[in-house]
Swiss-Prot record:
InterPro entries: SAUR_fam (IPR003676). Its main location: membrane. One of its GO terms (biological process) is response to light intensity. Higher expression in thermo-responsive cultivars (e.g. cv. Alst-1, cv. Ang-0 and cv. Com-0) than in low thermo-responsive cultivars (e.g. cv. Dja-1, cv. El-0 and cv. Kon). The lineage of its organism: Eukaryota, Viridiplantae, Streptophyta, Embryophyta, Tracheophyta. This is Auxin-responsive protein SAUR26. Pfam families: Auxin_inducible. Interacts with PP2C-D1. Belongs to the ARG7 family. Provide a mechanistic link between auxin and plasma membrane H(+)-ATPases (PM H(+)-ATPases, e.g. AHA1 and AHA2), and triggers PM H(+)-ATPases activity by promoting phosphorylation of their C-terminal autoinhibitory domain as a result of PP2C-D subfamily of type 2C phosphatases inhibition, thus leading to the acidification of the apoplast and the facilitation of solutes and water uptake to drive cell expansion. Functions as a positive effectors of cell expansion through modulation of auxin transport. Involved in thermo-responsiveness of plant architecture. Enhances plasma membrane H(+)-ATPase. The keyword Cell membrane applies.
Length: 93
């Protein structure tokens, strides 16, 4: 149950929303598109995550498996949303 609560709070903090929004990320954040299907979720992550080894590992695995050439235009992370939220939750605390 605690895991479910932490996933929901992480999604709230990360600003998870549907891709249809055109809102620019806040200063110091970047938008990433997460999901394995055509309907990806847009999340805002702090730019500082790019320096974190755990986040870099996620990006490397995605690059190896899928590459970074995606039609979404932004940084696309084709992994399960729950996995992404779990990893970014670890980076928060």
């Amino acid at each position: 149950m605690a895991l479910v609560r932490s996933l929901f709070s992480a999604k709230k903090i990360l600003g998870g929303s549907l891709v249809k929004t055109s809102k620019a990320p806040p200063k110091g954040f970047l938008a990433v598109y997460v999901g394995e299907s055509q309907k990806k979720q847009r999340h805002f992550v702090p730019v500082s995550y790019l320096n974190q080894p755990l986040f870099q590992d996620l990006l490397s695995k995605c690059e190896e498996e899928f590459g970074f050439d995606h039609p979404m235009g932004g940084l696309t992370i084709p992994c399960p949303v729950d996995t992404f939220i779990s990893i970014t939750s670890q980076l928060q605390g």
